[in-house]
Amino acid sequence: MSNDLNIILAQLNFHVGDIEGNCKKILENVELAKSMYAADCIAFTELALTGYPPEDLIFRAKIKDRIEKSISKILQASMDITVIVGTPWIENDSRFNAALVMRDQKIIAKYYKKILPNYGEFDEQRYFTAGTETCVFNLCGVSIGLTICEDVWVNGPVSQCRDSGAELVISINASPFHQYKHKERIDVVWKQVSGNHLPILYVNQVGGQDELVFDGYSFVMDVDKNIIVEASLCEEELLLVAYDKDRQALAGKRPVSHKPDRLEVIYQVLLLGLKDYVNKNGFAGGLVGLSGGIDSALVLT
């Protein structure tokens, strides 16, 4: 009998504000994780239920009820699998950027993001209250720590997981693209793994949302600071990783993906951003102005 713990990182494209549609996608992938992969756990990205960034939608009167109804449905689907879902969570009139951990139709753990970014495209301190508690939960005999996005960019949250007994850390993210962002993510995670001697499973959102594009590129870094598996650029993917409980070692279920060059990355990100901007806004078509230059030729293709 295998002593592997099978964990899926769900790199998916969610739609801001479509809570019911995002819930449906989560449920479909929970079933896939159980039926096709025999997974013990599936982790979805930061604020997957509402899409990221929800901005002022978070203040709407009915948002709490819609979130709780969807979480109730996901709870019902959590028999025999642990489901980690990023969602806003409202408690005692405070709003948190949360990760809920569900198994066997119960919420077994909650984590509230500690480090709320408030620069550039981020305005999380306007919407959320920072969490203060560390979350380490038991998954089939393995102690798992949780962080959310910005938490891994600073000293503190990962080391607090280590000090609370975590054997590995799952980081759920909605980290938007810029030209050197993926290298920055890897460098940041490398420092956390190096300093805390914990492997980190990093799952990122994919898809365009207005001016932001999330490039995916989820990855797993083992305790020796090797990237053992990496998801694709700009594509939805369920990334499967196995943790050998006896050897305390991680293994990817497929090789590290093809590494596109810089121009290919930029092209794919622009393509995804434009496609999702059109589709998510329900546009039936568009008008393309062509001047005859190389920029117009690229737009036309």
Where are these regions (language model features)?
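Enzyme catalytic cores with a strong preference for nitrogen-chemistry domains
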Residues: 1-301
